[in-house]
Amino acid sequence: MSKSDVFHLGLTKNDLQGATLAIVPGDPERVEKIAALMDKPVKLASHREFTSWRAELDGKSLIVCSTGIGGPSTSIRVEELASTLGVDSRTLTPRIGTTGAIQPHINVGDVLVTTASVRLDGASLHFAPMEFPAVETSTATRAGEARKSIGATTIGVTASDTFYPGQERYDTSGRERNSRSHIVRTLSILYQQQTYDTYSRVERFKGSMEEWQAMGVMNYEMESATVLTMCASQGLRAGMVAGVIVNRTQQEIPNAETMKSTESQFAVKIVVEAARRLL
């Protein structure tokens, strides 16, 4: 490896070609789809959950790089682009993903813009103390223009946490929710059916969704708190946009067809327009 290479992303500084914007979807499979809608798409590297492409939009170079799921892998992506590759404070990092709404009025297919995140992720504590806010740091005027152009329906606070207990899931096994405190999930572990109950030892998240709803939190996801905390504390600019694939007041797991159509419409088309407004 040359000195300019990074351990996980497999990129060199030269690969960026002066890019000052990095679009960061979670899913590696979305990266090529996003890059293909822009000019001169080039695949740079693919290693584990990190797939990276470079493309041009209105003559300006940008990077599309997946983060994988959750805060720790997301932090690697931010660290290796911003620190090792020397991306400066002009850099915009729009986090693009899918999400579950927790407010009844938010519909599947809606576009949400996060202004701040509830830091339930854990990883963000490695970059700033809990008292430090996880806030959007995009330039206000351009961010406002981007919100209008992508048809954002709701702007507000997001909760970043784990997929199961942090987002208070009970019915993943498919059983009816009769009594939350007694419902368990059955998982196949080492080819044997064993009973597993997320809430049998730590109960702090029982009833938490209703508390977040009362405080006006609009959705759950798993990465924005890490991205926003890291960038805000290091003088970088970042924002979060997400397409709603399920409303948690109605069901816990999204319908497969709904998820596919929402991802296709949102992640591949809307993000390019948002990037154009932010460049």
UniProtKB/Swiss-Prot annotation:
Key words, A-Z = Cytoplasm, Glycosyltransferase, Transferase
What GO biological process term is on the record, naming one? Answer: nucleoside catabolic process
The reactions it catalyses are: uridine + phosphate = alpha-D-ribose 1-phosphate + uracil
Question: Where's it mainly located?
Answer: cytoplasm
- Say which domain of life the source belongs to: Bacteria
One Gene Ontology cellular component term attached to this UniProt record is: cytosol
Location within or outside the cell: Cytoplasm
Asked if the keyword Cytoplasm belongs to this entry, the reply reads: yes
Q: Which pathway does this polypeptide act in? A: Pyrimidine metabolism; UMP biosynthesis via salvage pathway; uracil from uridine (phosphorylase route): step 1/1
In the record, what terms sit under GO molecular function?
uridine phosphorylase activity
Q: Which InterPro entries match?
A: Nucleoside_phosphorylase_CS (IPR018016), Nucleoside_phosphorylase_d (IPR000845), Nucleoside_phosphorylase_sf (IPR035994)
Enzyme Commission number: 2.4.2.3
Its job: Catalyzes the reversible phosphorylytic cleavage of uridine to uracil and ribose-1-phosphate.
Assembly and partners are described as: Homohexamer.
Q: Which family does it belong to?
A: Belongs to the PNP/UDP phosphorylase family.
Its name, as the record gives it, is Uridine phosphorylase
Q: Which organism is it from?
A: Klebsiella pneumoniae
Name of the gene: udp
